[in-house]
Amino acid sequence: MNLEVIAQLTVLSLIVLSGPLVIILLAANRGNL
């Protein structure tokens, strides 16, 4: 695997993981847990 492919996969995985995390953090800040 090339470094470019690994970099793209890591960026995609971070975006996919950051999606739900941002929603959870926003809900926690609003106290809607």
Curated annotation (Swiss-Prot):
It comes from the Eukaryota. It is found in: Plastid, Chloroplast thylakoid membrane. GO terms for cellular component: chloroplast thylakoid membrane; photosystem II. The keyword Ribonucleoprotein does not apply. One of its GO terms (biological process) is photosynthesis. Keywords: Chloroplast, Membrane, Photosynthesis, Photosystem II, Plastid, Thylakoid, Transmembrane, Transmembrane helix. The chain crosses the membrane at residues 5-25. InterPro entries: PSII_Ycf12_core-subunit. Its main location: plastid. Signal peptide: none annotated. Pfam families: PSII_Ycf12. A core subunit of photosystem II (PSII), probably helps stabilize the reaction center. NCBIfam families: PRK13686.1 (NF010239). This is Photosystem II reaction center protein Psb30. It comes from Chlorokybus atmophyticus (Soil alga). The gene is psb30.
